Amino acid sequence: MSYPASIYNATTLKQEIFSKLRLQKKKELLRDVEALKDYTLHIENGEHVGVIGHNGSGKSTLLKTIAGVYPVVSGTVDVKGSIHSLFDLGLGFDLESSGRENIIYRGLLLGATPAEIEAKSQEIIDFADLGEFIDYPIKSYSSGMLVRLAFSVSTSLTGDILLLDEVVGAGDASFMAKAQRRMKELMNGSKIMVFVTHNTTLVQQVCNRVIMMDHGRIVKDGKPDEVVAFYKKAMCAP
């Protein structure tokens, strides 16, 4: 699968929007980047798939391809079911708006309806536990507070397919304990999970299938213990 080169330069929502506008006007000036190569991946209901590999191997690109974040120029993606993505947690936030207002913005970006967001708002506020800061502009938040709000919004919504890029670190020990419990509930409740991680111990605990990626290719696909052993051996090779 390949993508317009400009997509990799878009690190914020505003930049991504402008990159797409430039793409429409200057297609002849862009080249495509072949990020994922020579593979077919089929995931069935009930499969919790871990994705491992070195930095730059294509793990996160695969996840964002499934989510529809990257516009595919060549290749096809066929997804059946609703997607629940847990990555780029800060995407869609407006620094000048309050935490309460940003719950709406983030929820809409994740595909929730206004009615669904309204029904979940108090649960999100209680879980984030930001006190009176929920009505302050989020530009006044610490990084930990911002992550707590983002995590609370993102994990309050459900879908058939859970896409997860690492386990989120979300503040103090008390909140981390809540966050870990919620993550386990999401993992256990999802029909399909695709989990990108460097933690080989965790991937063996929560996944029933693991793939290893290298330079945009799937080089191993199978049982967690077998693929993790192959990965560790490959990492130790000269």
Named regions from a protein language model:
Residues K14-L21, I104, E116-F133:
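Conserved ABC ATPase "signature" region
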Residues H215-G216, Y231:
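Conserved ABC ATPase "signature" C-loop
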